[in-house]
Amino acid sequence: MAATTSKPIALVTGATAGIGAAFAEHLAQLGHDLVITARDLARLEQSASELRSKHGIEVEVIKADLATNEGIRTIELRLENISRPIEVLINNAGFGINKSFSVSDRQLENDLLDVLVRAPLRFMHAVLPAMKERDSGTIINVSSVAGWIAGGSYSAAKSYLTVMSESLHTELLGTNVKVHALCPGFTRTEFHQRGRMKMNGLPEFLWLDASEVVATAWRSSQKGKALSIPGSQYKLLSFLMRYIPRPIVRKVGMNARKRQR
């Protein structure tokens, strides 16, 4: 369904579960109409129906596989549609690979880069001109504290997303366009199950709630901050990862990866 009201419109990728679904719910509560995207059309339609019924908003559904150029281009075209401008962009879609790089599937590695790096880059490039023109807009990139450690392609991709967000945040200082990196730790979502990652034995205090993660990110972004790290435990971890010797950081990253296999 196309948005027809005068409410601000937010586009959320990977919107059917986890942090993406929490962002859709949070923005709906704030009065935004939504464009939600994911690969599973049935789940998208179900989510859209629930959001419309609960919040009385317009919800547009776009099925797109961001591991393909066609899928990325579909979202780009929507972001470039200035007749129904996107006020908020949430780059959330992502997945992990539960194998070491040397034995993982090469196409899967390329897909990871498309979804976690190329898609957010192209989406930001598509939406920023209109945001700058009207001097209004928010982009939140869902990164990860994994970007601070040596944890394979996923960590490398999240490191890129964090640094790119910080760079654009600095570039846009003095405007009303906000770019923000959300860097959560372990969050209760479908992410780990889909990636077949073993999370048994992870201490309870390390788990975060998706709704609280999203609320933290939104508050921080609207205050003009470049990034947010929800949870005191992850703030401490991020601080340590930046200042302890890199050999230790590399060992922590590799040990964490091994425990998940």
Where are these regions (language model features)?
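Conserved glycine-rich cofactor-binding loop
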Residues: T16-A17
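SDR active-site lid
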Residues: E171-Q233
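Conserved NAD(P)H cofactor-binding loop of Rossmann-fold oxidoreductase domains
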Residues: N92-I97
